[in-house]
């Protein structure tokens, strides 16, 4: 094989990650931010090149999937085509499933971050930085480890505080800031109630009550 067969398998495995070369696609609105989500620094994520789950070194901004699947939001499953083909990101342009060398070379280089895109928005960027500091995965991982040790009660309390703050800041920017709810996963990453499953944590929420258990 030396050309794309339009099978759509690469699109069904998840949308691309963005690099600095893609910045204008977002800033000019060709790919609106509400269709994106952020894998935050330190978060466990699947490395598509190495084929394993590992903490990421920096923000990774990606296109959301369709509903509960990883299929890229812009993939037309009936026509087996891309809705943004002419303005597709760098990773989509260099990907050749029969020869992944070019993708492997650019995969971890010059990744686009939230700071690149929204650090100039006063107030909002302060909230993002505060959220990143208080919900840092480098703080969360030791607490998860301590859940099975002598420090488990303190660890559980601290972890619940972080999870509650993560939920509260999202509600706050919607109710008081009038922010579009679809922007939350881009600005603050995915909710901890979703991502902590990768760390073996099961979270159950009933109203304002949150319960967490080890799987």
Regions found by a protein language model. Give the residues of each.
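Hydrophobic scaffolds flanking metal-cofactor catalytic centers in soluble metalloenzymes
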Residues: 1-215
